[in-house]
């Protein structure tokens, strides 16, 4: 199994909908949240603002069941495909990426 490079403390973690490949959110994992994700099969992240671990959906019920975990070529960024239950964004939107800045370049 490929190891993840946590030498900088946190790794950006991109969450994709396993059904359609849509980007749902970006969060950060530290080594402990990564291990909890591997152990439970559900996403755990590290909150930079609260300085603590959080289990996605533990309060809202909008959980993310892990289907696949990928790493980039440097092993310092993760991409996780999930089965999303309910919206991924705390605003109630399906994805955290709903603010279009510009298109038609």
From Swiss-Prot:
UniProt keyword annotation of Plastid present: no
Cofactor(s), names only, from the UniProt record: Mg(2+); Zn(2+)
GO MF term set: magnesium ion binding; phosphoribosyl-AMP cyclohydrolase activity; zinc ion binding
Any one Gene Ontology cellular component term annotated for this protein: cytoplasm
Compartments, as annotated in UniProt: Cytoplasm
Reactions it catalyzes: 1-(5-phospho-beta-D-ribosyl)-5'-AMP + H2O = 1-(5-phospho-beta-D-ribosyl)-5-[(5-phospho-beta-D-ribosylamino)methylideneamino]imidazole-4-carboxamide
Family: Belongs to the PRA-CH family.
Full protein name: Phosphoribosyl-AMP cyclohydrolase
Origin species: Listeria monocytogenes serotype 4b (strain CLIP80459)
Gene that specifies this protein: hisI
